[in-house]
Amino acid sequence: MAADSKEQYSLVLEYADSNTLKDYLNQHFKELQWNDKIGLALQLASAVSFLHEFDIVHCDLHAGNVLIHQKKIKLADFGLSKKIDEVSSSTSRIFGVIPYTDPKAFNHQHTINNPRKNYKLNKKSDVYSIGVLMWQISSGCQPFDS
């Protein structure tokens, strides 16, 4: 290989024909039956349960990080995901979309011995996000939208 030539890399990703959950609900909510909504909710819970079985916390679940392909849920954006031991040994910061974030993450406790004790995102944080997503799937509305 010549010194001036550059290697090129390609990233191949699976295609999601219906885009994000947010887009899918905006476009198809009125035609979804309750069985469809329940199916999406079960798929979402199953996908996150699979992660948790391997002690992985997603940490950034929201309607923009859930993709839909042929009416099947695909979790995306694992950039903030952590193994449980990594999450519990590091300080967690809030990166995700606020309405989907575990409210405990905003409760900073100040004590004399520990000036700032940050809440560590965990499996329960993902479960909270799933609850918000399930509400969005069932209602068709953005969370906490006025």
Task: Please describe what each predicted stretch is.
Residues M1-Y9:
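Short beta-strand micro-motifs within the conserved protein kinase catalytic domain, predominantly
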Residues A16-N26:
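Structural motif in protein kinase domains
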Residues Q27-L42:
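Activation segment of protein kinase catalytic domains, centered on the conserved DFG
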Residues D126:
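Conserved catalytic-loop aspartate of Hanks-type protein kinases
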Residues T91-Q109:
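Conserved activation segment of eukaryotic-like protein kinases, specifically the C-terminal portion
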Residues H52-I68:
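Catalytic-loop of the protein kinase fold
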